[in-house]
């Protein structure tokens, strides 16, 4: 879900940002010995605590990848659950070092909030879920005129919903809540006919409902929701480390480097693989970035490549079973693409 920044940042917020940016994030992180990662309050497949209280998901694993790049140890990360309303302030103030919380990259957030998005870890789009028993025969969002629709307030989801119904000359009754947990509970209790959010979120939320099989995700996608991690503006070194961690995950998948074979691949005769894994004698890619030259080895050992992260958290190896689709590599018809690591 995505919070909308309304109005102009106040002087107090700007002061917090200036204070947070006064020291190098890398130095601060190294001094405390871990990365503080802002995640959701609980979204299956992306960031949610398991039965042992350990955070799991694509967004959580991305922060582990950053920790592995910096420390050589993917466990050196602590997670801070943040609501949609809290997330940007937490990053601006320095409460978290990285925000990896199913957040949509928009022009306002990129230019007005003092944030830098590092890439798109998940290409998503807004969709609709219905209780098929309450709305028998409905198989398209264009059949939802007059429906009560549950939605989280202060989000791009809320705005997209209004635009979609207006554009299609339909009426609807918005049932609005501030917290995601409240939206989930209201929909499950039957207070609305329809639930709208990112389609990936709908698949995750469906698993938590009382009777998951009764609920159907409709085929329409009504928006572009490029979800990705963000860092504070003003610290280029930290931005580069986090950004190239994302690209390293993609490059590892493209080159066939996995958690299981990364040590073996260090002996590959392929010059590109040797360069990416820091095995060339004169390589300084890692040290120029501010980490060790075997930073990609450490990342892959900790979490695997991008494809492995996707599959176990949201894809074929997860309860969500979401197809790769446009999140496949560019070589397989998708949008995921890394610039050269050289």
Residue ranges with predicted function:
Residues 1-8:
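Bacterial N-terminal signal peptides that target proteins for export
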Residues 61-64, 68-70, 132-135, 142, ...:
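Extended ligand-binding regions for polar small-molecule ligands
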Residues 28-100, 284, 291, 299-306, ...:
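Extracytoplasmic small-molecule ligand-binding "clamshell" domains
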Residues 16-23:
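Sec/Tat signal peptide C-region and signal peptidase I cleavage site
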Residues 64, 68, 72, 76-143, ...:
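Acidic, polar ligand-binding/catalytic clefts
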Residues 30-31, 67-75, 92-96, 104, ...:
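Sec-exported extracytoplasmic/periplasmic mature domains
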Residues 36-45, 55-70, 124-182:
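Bilobed "Venus flytrap"/periplasmic-binding protein-like clamshell domains
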Residues 278-342:
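C-terminal functional modules
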């Amino acid at each position: 879900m995505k919070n909308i920044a309304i109005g102009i940042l106040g002087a107090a917020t700007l002061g917090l940002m200036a204070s947070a940016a006064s020291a190098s994030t890398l130095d601060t992180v190294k001094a405390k010995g871990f990365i503080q990662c802002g995640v959701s309050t609980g979204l299956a497949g992306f960031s949610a605590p398991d039965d042992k209280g350990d955070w799991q998901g694509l967004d959580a694993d991305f922060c582990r990848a950053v920790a592995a790049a910096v420390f050589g140890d993917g466990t050196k990360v602590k997670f801070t659950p943040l609501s949609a309303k809290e997330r940007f302030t937490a990053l601006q103030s320095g409460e978290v070092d990285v925000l990896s919380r199913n957040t949509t990259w928009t022009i306002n957030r990129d230019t007005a909030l003092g944030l830098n998005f590092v890439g798109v870890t998940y290409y998503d789009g807004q969709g609709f879920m219905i209780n098929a028993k309450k709305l028998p025969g409905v198989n398209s969002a264009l059949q939802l005129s007059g429906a009560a629709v549950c939605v989280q307030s202060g989000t791009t989801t809320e705005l997209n919903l209004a635009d979609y119904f207006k554009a299609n000359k339909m009426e609807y009754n918005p049932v609005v809540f501030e917290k995601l947990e409240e939206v989930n509970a209201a929909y499950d209790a039957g207070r609305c006919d329809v639930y709208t959010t990112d389609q990936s979120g709908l698949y995750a939320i469906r698993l938590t409902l009382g009777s998951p099989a009764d609920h159907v995700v409709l085929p329409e996608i009504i928006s572009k929701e490029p979800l990705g991690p963000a860092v504070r503006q003003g610290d280029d070194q930290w931005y580069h480390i986090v950004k190239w961690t994302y690209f390293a995950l993609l490059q590892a998948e493209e080159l066939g480097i996995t958690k299981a074979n990364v040590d073996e691949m260090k002996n590959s005769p392929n010059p590109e693989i040797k360069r990416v894994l820091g095995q060339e004698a004169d390589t300084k890619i890692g040290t120029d970035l501010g980490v060790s030259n075997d930073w990609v080895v450490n990342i892959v050992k900790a979490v695997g490549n991008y494809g492995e992260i996707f599959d176990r958290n949201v894809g074929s190896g997860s309860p969500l079973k979401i197809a790769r689709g446009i999140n496949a590599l560019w070589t397989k018809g998708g949008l995921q693409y890394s610039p050269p690591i050289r």
